[in-house]
């Protein structure tokens, strides 16, 4: 019997398997950049997918069936999510810092101009503008879903959340199509490396956010979320809005400016 409101978690293999998978993914990308095989990347993605699914399943069981997510536990989860998003903010700040450091005072090695001489950037009013419209629309639909849950309109919540997920998938597809059309590579100096690193990392966040929303979708569908206990969905919505805001900065400074 517990005499405190906190949840002391059981031993779980998923943190260590997720860590090993993340390390394998990083090593896989290094190998790929050295023109080696992509097998390690594919294996790492599979391991991350399995670990994430199992970890989410365990958390859902603890909160929905075992009743471990008390008011105090939820406060801790909220603080953890806020700190996680804050760490992600500083991660993107480092990329923008590198971009502005090079673009505001371009040196003679890149022709004393920005974009560097020989680099042909994307037209911001084609796919980038379309993707901006898609992400802004997805921010509206996820907010719609949020309010529908609070009003116990779960059918509307499911429909609007499904639209959000489809918009996220559409964004990822258009981003990939844009990369295939690019007239420069990640190895083309500071412009190519900062552009593809920042937009690619953002694209990864969109993919993760879409999976996060998909988990929330199935939890709502299986009646594991109620109008007074829905932090799992709320966390995914916070993450999605963060992705939206980062894209607005990306579009403004890396495409348009």
Swiss-Prot record:
Keywords: Membrane, Mitochondrion, Mitochondrion inner membrane, Translocase, Transmembrane, Transmembrane helix. The chain crosses the membrane at residues 13-33, 36-56, 80-100, 154-174, 195-215, 237-257. GO terms for cellular component: mitochondrial inner membrane. Component of the cytochrome c oxidase (complex IV, CIV), a multisubunit enzyme composed of a catalytic core of 3 subunits and several supernumerary subunits. The complex exists as a monomer or a dimer and forms supercomplexes (SCs) in the inner mitochondrial membrane with ubiquinol-cytochrome c oxidoreductase (cytochrome b-c1 complex, complex III, CIII). This is Cytochrome c oxidase subunit 3. Component of the cytochrome c oxidase, the last enzyme in the mitochondrial electron transport chain which drives oxidative phosphorylation. The respiratory chain contains 3 multisubunit complexes succinate dehydrogenase (complex II, CII), ubiquinol-cytochrome c oxidoreductase (cytochrome b-c1 complex, complex III, CIII) and cytochrome c oxidase (complex IV, CIV), that cooperate to transfer electrons derived from NADH and succinate to molecular oxygen, creating an electrochemical gradient over the inner membrane that drives transmembrane transport and the ATP synthase. It catalyses: 4 Fe(II)-[cytochrome c] + O2 + 8 H(+)(in) = 4 Fe(III)-[cytochrome c] + 2 H2O + 4 H(+)(out). It is an enzyme of class 7 (translocase). GO terms for molecular function: cytochrome-c oxidase activity. Its main location: mitochondrion. It holds the Pfam family COX3. CDD domains: Cyt_c_Oxidase_III (cd01665). It is found in: Mitochondrion inner membrane. One of its GO terms (biological process) is mitochondrial electron transport, cytochrome c to oxygen. SUPFAM superfamilies: Cytochrome c oxidase subunit III-like. The keyword Mitochondrion applies. Gene3D superfamilies: 1.10.287.70, Cytochrome c oxidase, subunit III, four-helix bundle (1.20.120.80). Belongs to the cytochrome c oxidase subunit 3 family.
């Amino acid at each position: 019997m517990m005499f405190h409101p906190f949840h002391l978690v059981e031993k779980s293999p998923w943190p260590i398997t997720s860590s090993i998978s993340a390390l394998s993914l990083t090593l896989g990308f290094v190998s790929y950049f050295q023109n080696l095989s992509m097998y390690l990347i594919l294996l790492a993605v599979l391991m991350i997918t399995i670990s994430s699914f199992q970890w989410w399943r365990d958390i859902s069981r603890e909160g929905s069936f075992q009743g471990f997510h008390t008011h105090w536990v939820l406060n801790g989860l909220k603080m953890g999510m806020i700190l996680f998003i804050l760490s992600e903010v500083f991660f993107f700040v480092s990329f923008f810092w590198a971009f502005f450091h090079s673009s505001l005072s371009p040196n003679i090695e890149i022709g004393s101009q920005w974009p560097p001489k020989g680099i042909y950037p994307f037209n911001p009013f084609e796919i980038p503008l379309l993707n901006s419209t898609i992400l802004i629309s997805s921010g509206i639909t996820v907010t719609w879903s949020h309010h529908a849950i609070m009003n116990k309109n779960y059918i509307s919540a499911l429909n609007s959340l499904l639209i959000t997920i489809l918009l996220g998938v559409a964004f990822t597809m258009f981003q990939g199509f844009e990369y295939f059309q690019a007239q420069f590579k990640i190895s083309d100096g500071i412009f190519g490396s900062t552009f593809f690193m920042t937009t690619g990392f953002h694209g990864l966040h969109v993919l993760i956010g879409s999976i996060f929303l998909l988990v929330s979708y199935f939890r709502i569908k299986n009646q594991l979320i109620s109008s007074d206990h829905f932090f799992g969905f709320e966390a995914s919505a916070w993450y999605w809005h963060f992705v939206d805001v980062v894209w607005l900065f990306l579009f403004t400074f890396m495409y348009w400016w």
